[in-house]
Design a protein with these regions (language model features):
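Phosphate/nucleotide-binding beta-alpha loop and adjacent structural elements of enzyme active sites
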Residues: 1-276
Length: 276
């Protein structure tokens, strides 16, 4: 049902901080089903060739840092920890094993590009972002490109690990100001507090909240989405967010508008074990 709603490659995905860390990105099923094209931004030169090989024709790799358009210092750390912000030694020392992971190996001067200024990037439908503390900077400088975006998935920190890093609350306020509401946590990461080890293993999580991948969606409660936005939100909800109830809401609305046959809506609901 959902695949028939969209032309091949219709969903425009932006992945900011696209380094491959051993896990498939949340939009992988959209690519596998021919529904999306990803613009992958990654300033770490160690990752660029791998990204190009993995994405092939389904992606465009842009080896640049996204930010506020100003010149910054890229702090190159272990994979997954590199950031435009400097790691905070006090925060790292609070958690077991983080001091080594957040050790800065080298620094590089980089000139960032504002999302709104990137001509080769079309308006974004689905933004995935993992930029180690620079999320708010990117969002504030990408309001035009995100004007019709329907889903944003980003990593946000409950405890900040970088100097000057905005906490979860500041990012949440910006997302709401741009017309999004929280939809779900894809995961919530906890970690053990140093120096005590649980079972002697630093990888065993304690109770301290650390960070989470959170999904925001365009506000369906107070806002009106056009047909194209509803189609894309249904596809992203189903294939990337594992949210059949959200996809169903979009399909039912498309049915009310005469865009989708009632039988197609019923077919999806039945397949997902849902009832009206």
């Amino acid at each position: 049902v959902i695949e028939a709603l969209l032309a091949p490659g219709a969903i425009r995905i932006a992945d900011i901080g696209a380094a491959f860390l051993g896990e498939a990105p949340p939009y992988q099923s959209l690519l596998d089903n021919g529904l999306g094209h990803v613009f992958a931004f990654e300033p770490d030169a160690r990752q660029v060739d791998t990204l190009r090989a993995r994405l092939g024709a389904k992606g465009t790799v842009i080896a640049e840092a996204v930010g506020d358009g100003a010149r910054h210092t890229l702090h190159v750390c272990n994979y997954g920890w590199s950031s435009l912000l400097e790691p905070d030694p006090a925060a790292l020392a609070f958690f077991n094993s983080f001091a080594a992971l957040g050790r800065v190996e080298t620094t590089l001067p980089v000139t960032t590009r504002r999302l709104d200024d990137i001509a080769e990037l079309p308006p974004v439908d689905f933004l995935k972002m993992d930029v180690q503390g620079a999320e708010l900077m990117v969002l504030q400088n990408g309001r035009r490109k995100l004007g019709t975006c329907v889903v944003v998935q980003l990593e946000t920190s409950f405890v900040t690990l970088y100097k000057g890093q905005p906490p979860f609350g500041a990012v949440d306020l910006e997302m709401r100001a741009q017309g999004f509401i929280p939809h779900r946590f894809m995961d919530i990461k906890r970690w053990s507090i140093a120096p005590a080890l649980i079972g002697g293993d630093p990888r065993v999580a304690g109770n301290q909240l650390l960070e989470s991948d959170i999904v925001y969606v365009r506000d369906l409660i107070h806002g009106t989405l056009n047909d194209d936005q509803l189609r894309k939100l249904a596809a992203i909800a189903h294939f990337a967010c594992r949210s059949p109830d959200l996809a169903a809401r979009c399909l039912i609305e498309l049915g009310k508008r005469g865009v989708l046959e009632d039988s197609a809506v019923l077919s999806y609901l039945t397949a997902q074990g849902l009832k009206r």
